[in-house]
């Protein structure tokens, strides 16, 4: 038992020593985190995520969280007798569904995340893109193999982001938690894919990192091998051959766009892994897949 404790202590010391250069490097920088998947539904992972976010803030990194809420939305739609439908990974959202989406994201999910972070000593503040109209949206039309310009209801894409609200929260020492609901020119609400919001927000904030938490280890090839580094060219090939499809498409598109437009590192990581954020940011090996803005695959 004593030997095990010594080994454990040695491992902890090694981990701290490995983390120190990264703490120095990233202190003062912004990290936008797309929070979703199992990490949002399993109690132990939810608590671990909250602790990790608080730790990031304590060592000088400024986390900004953009959350999804697909399972929670589906559960509420089922309760009212509506079936969730998707086109190219995007949720079909009529007026009734939009009311439910906004209620679940802004009312339940956002407040739960804020409360969890604050329980562990953080100062999280929840906001929606409709607050101060800081996320302006326009209707998103989807091209499918059968038809171009498919209207899927009150689903939007980001037209512009005014980062003043989020930057103000960061300057006050707060952790912004953003619900991905935008506002149209007539004041109407738009459901925006959280990956799209996270990517665009990372660009506008000149973030050091964009980290997208998901339920898979990262981007895989057809044989199931993890691809640790990818370029836009390689990703185009994976989409063309059908390796990437469905819900991965908006995630990948956002990661690529952010990388191309100046976010220094974009990552797709496995949110099912305890301490996934810390493993990516503070260890030499990292986890998941890194999207590069250009150049050759490594």
Curated annotation (Swiss-Prot):
Give the main localization category.
Answer: cytoplasm
User: Which top EC class is named for this enzyme in its record?
Assistant: transferase
Q: Which UniProt keywords apply?
A: Amino-acid biosynthesis, Arginine biosynthesis, ATP-binding, Cytoplasm, Kinase, Nucleotide-binding, Transferase
Cellular component, GO, one term:
cytoplasm
> What reaction does this catalyse?
N-acetyl-L-glutamate + ATP = N-acetyl-L-glutamyl 5-phosphate + ADP
Per the record, the pathway is: Amino-acid biosynthesis; L-arginine biosynthesis; N(2)-acetyl-L-ornithine from L-glutamate: step 2/4
Annotated positions for site Transition state stabilizer: 34, 251
Where is it localised?
A: Cytoplasm
Listed GO molecular functions?
A: acetylglutamate kinase activity; ATP binding
- Binding residues annotated for substrate, in chain numbering: 69-70, 91, 191
Q: Which GO terms describe its biological process?
A: arginine biosynthetic process via ornithine; L-arginine biosynthetic process
| Transmembrane segments annotated in the record for this chain | none
| EC numbers, comma separated | 2.7.2.8
Q: Does this UniProt record's set of keywords contain Kinase?
A: yes
Per its UniProt record, what CDD domains does this chain match? Answer: AAK_NAGK-C (cd04250)
Could you tell me which NCBIfam families the record lists for this protein? argB
Tell me, in a sentence or two, what this protein's role is: Catalyzes the ATP-dependent phosphorylation of N-acetyl-L-glutamate.
Family according to the record = Belongs to the acetylglutamate kinase family. ArgB subfamily.
Output this protein's name: Acetylglutamate kinase
Q: Which organism is it from?
A: Neisseria meningitidis serogroup A / serotype 4A (strain DSM 15465 / Z2491)
